[in-house]
Regions:
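Register-specific beta-strand positions within repetitive beta-rich fiber domains
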Residues: 1-19
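Extracellular jelly-roll beta-sandwich "head" domains, especially the C-terminal globular C1q domain
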Residues: 17-167
Length: 167
């Protein structure tokens, strides 16, 4: 006899071997505002955890160091503002892996500058489960060398997150 997988099934007992979990996982956000200097890659102070299933995100170093090896889906979303300081020429979300720039979003405008930016970056990153880590960074270049503000009234606009992919 064969099973029709399109049917509905009612189980008693425990079903095993189905699904999986996407942990460790975390999400962190900025609490307030951070000022970034023009033409400088700066680590973001995303110091408020939304959740952290394995205490793998450090709110003082802004590092995610998972202790479970595998592939992770990582995201960085940034709300930035050039404060009317000549507007953005370049704005990049950046993820550093083990202290070096590894992933970067692309925003580079030769004309028609913007004062506000929303930079998003996602990457699938393999971690060794012991010492590998990622950190959130931002790079901005304004038309007249003015400072940039990250965060603001809705601090959930700037977030950093990751979760383990079920393999």
């Amino acid at each position: 006899e064969s099973i029709n997988l399109a049917d509905n099934f009612a189980f008693t007992g425990t079903v095993t071997g189905a699904g999986g979990v996407n942990t460790p996982a975390f999400a962190a956000r900025i609490n307030g505002e951070q000022t970034i200097s023009h033409n400088t890659s700066t680590k973001l102070t995303l110091n408020t955890e939304i959740f952290d299933t394995a205490n793998a995100y450090d709110t003082s170093t802004y590092r995610f160091t998972p202790q479970t090896a595998g592939k992770y889906y990582c995201t960085l979303n940034i709300n930035s503002n050039a404060n009317g300081q000549g507007n953005f020429r370049i704005a990049n979300a950046q993820i550093y892996f083990n202290g070096s720039l590894a992933y970067i979003s692309g925003y580079d405008k030769a004309t028609g500058y913007e004062n506000n930016g929303r930079e998003s970056l996602s990457a699938i990153i393999t971690f060794n489960g012991s010492s590998d880590y990622i950190e959130p960074y931002f790079y901005g270049y304004t038309q007249n060398s003015g400072n940039i503000t990250i965060g603001g009234t809705n601090t959930y606009d700037s977030q950093f997150s990751a979760y383990k992919i079920i393999e």
